[in-house]
């Protein structure tokens, strides 16, 4: 795992209570107050990482991960890195190629994230893609026996939206002890 996540030394940014607040921010801010709350929660995230993981936080980021890959490449004795990256991994691969162009072997970047795009542009593109994928799913499901979203794809999309709206109001219990909210389900 890249430094700072999962089975590497994880960066500690938020307490459980703060993480709950962060994860449960309204996924569809509709009012100025909703947007302000989302921005406020998001702005507190980064500084808390620096406060709670002062030794690790300054060494987290894509260029560090790319450099770690180069160390691994060297340790296994390869002259060039052969790499398969998906989603964010495509950004890691592109960064590696930029930092170490003479050490690039074969790169497969599947579902490439354009490093020139802003986070807002990436998010917008993903939202459009997810919307298309959801409609395609309900179209496929409509042709199957006992499709839970029904035989009308648009109505199926609405059925899913209604379920998420219900979960926003009435979170579902989960084995983790944290309820499943609409923010976490989307």
Ranges and model annotations:
Residues 2-183:
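Gly/Pro-rich cap/lid or specificity-loop segments adjacent to the active site
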């Amino acid at each position: 795992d890249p430094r700072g996540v999962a089975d590497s030394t994880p960066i500690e940014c938020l307490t459980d209570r703060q993480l709950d607040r962060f994860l449960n921010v309204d996924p569809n801010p509709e009012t100025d107050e909703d947007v302000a709350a989302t921005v406020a929660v998001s702005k507190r995230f980064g500084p808390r990482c620096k406060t709670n993981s002062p030794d690790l936080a300054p060494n987290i980021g894509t260029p560090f991960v790319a450099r770690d890959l180069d160390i691994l490449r060297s340790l296994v004795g390869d002259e060039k890195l052969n790499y398969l990256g998906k989603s964010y991994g495509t950004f890691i691969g592109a960064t590696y190629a930029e930092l170490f162009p003479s050490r690039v072997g074969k790169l497969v970047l599947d579902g490439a994230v354009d490093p020139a795009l802003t986070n807002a542009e990436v998010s917008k593109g993903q939202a459009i893609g997810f919307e298309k994928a959801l409609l395609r799913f309900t179209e496929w499901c409509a042709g199957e026996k006992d499709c839970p979203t029904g035989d009308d794809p648009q109505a199926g999309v609405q059925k899913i939206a209604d379920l998420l709206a219900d979960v926003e109001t009435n979170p579902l219990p989960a084995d983790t002890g944290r309820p499943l909210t609409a923010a976490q389900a989307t």
